[in-house]
Amino acid sequence: MVRRQSAPRLEFEAAAIYEYPEHLRPFLSEAPALPGVYIFHSESDTLPLYIGKSVNIRSRVLSHLRTPDEAAMLRQARRISWICTAGEMGALLLEARLIKEQQPLFNKRLRRNRQLCSLQLSEQKIEVVSARSVDFSHEPNLFGLFANRRAALQSLQNLADEQKLCYGLLGLEPVSRGRACFRFALKRCAGACCGQETPQAHFLRLQASLERLRVVCWPWKGAIALKESRPQMTQFHIINNWLWLGAVPSLDEAATLVRTPAGFDQDGYKILCKPLMSGQYEIIELHTDCRQS
């Protein structure tokens, strides 16, 4: 008996059904080879499909049009718009704000995290603190930014496992004074719970291990302006407590943006901390009237 073979199953990969989006070609010809943010729009003007950033808008948009994996988004796109910035920093900041505000269909969602937590070290103890009760922009000795309390505790547990720190002294499990914990018997704890290591030595090891996660306090008295320039365009990014308040073409207009932010902006911190602390940009501290001579 001849076994009947079934027809091979067709795999509709993106590359197999991709067609170059000719309807978007006119927008590509107008796209500038400059830094900024670009937006793919559907027929609806209220819900963008995708928001991205680049130091060269034209080049980046072209790469989207040639990518089969983005066929679904490209088929829905009806037009492309863009906003030019003075440089990469402005593009990063504007992209993050627009994604958070407009929630594009094909972007990873960015939302204000109301459960944001950190680990605070004080008086030889560590505890989880929430951004709802502590100002992360100014509170010292904070380590790590976590989506919630559970994530913070998991990170602390991972650190304890790596460094053979004592769960009991870290508050991760109950401890009986003077008695070795279960992990000590397994050689997973250095013995701070039973006198094999002093509490001070244990604390110093914990402190050293956490240092790479330190949250940097806002180092200025108030708002600052970060200057970013390219030929034919200069922007002053107004920033306070790690929050980007917006950009203006001159310092005389800074007063229209300066305010004290409510809460801590995790996305702003991640974008701004390293560049601001590295000294790679010109920073101007803003006075009360926000005018510079």
From Swiss-Prot:
One of its GO terms (molecular function) is nuclease activity. It comes from the Bacteria. SUPFAM superfamilies: GIY-YIG endonuclease. It is an enzyme of class 3 (hydrolase). Its EC number is 3.1.25.-. Residues 33-108 form the GIY-YIG domain. PROSITE patterns: GIY_YIG. CDD domains: GIY-YIG_UvrC_Cho (cd10434). Incises the DNA at the 3' side of a lesion during nucleotide excision repair. Incises the DNA farther away from the lesion than UvrC. Not able to incise the 5' site of a lesion. When a lesion remains because UvrC is not able to induce the 3' incision, Cho incises the DNA. Then UvrC makes the 5' incision. The combined action of Cho and UvrC broadens the substrate range of nucleotide excision repair. This is Excinuclease cho.
